[in-house]
Amino acid sequence: MPAECSSDRFEFARVASRAVVAGFDGGTITSNAGALLLGATDRSIGLVQRFAACFVDHRAPDQVEHGLTTLVGQRVLALALGYEDLADHDHLRHDPVLAATMGRLAARRAGYAALAGKSTLNRLEHAPAGEPSRYHRIGHDGAAIERLFVELFLDAHRTPPEEIVLDLDAT
């Protein structure tokens, strides 16, 4: 039995007044279209915004091209899409679907990509707790991240469970 599509087009949330539409007629193809669904889910639960709030950005605002929420969102979405290596971001920084999901169709300044590359994201991932240094101007609050994981878990349930079992595998 052949598959039947009920719609020729599927519309997602607009980005900077532009329509984002999935068409099934064969035009430009991307392997990252799942990012649009992840982005819609994120907008409903606020994961990226809440996770980004666990970091402190000490960078000079007038010199920042990629804001903290964009950095965190780019990394979270890439991990969810299966891109676990930071080196992947030198290619992903030019991906129009990932950029649209993050609400960035283009960079604010000439010569920059819409999203960050591996070096900038490396500084985010290795953000130390405490005072900023020359190369680490983004810090994290480990306790806030731990609280967020618990909050997200509890938000996903109608009533808090009687018991939570953490099954940690050290292998």
Annotate the PLM regions.
Residues 1-171:
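Dynamic "connector" segments at or just before major functional cores
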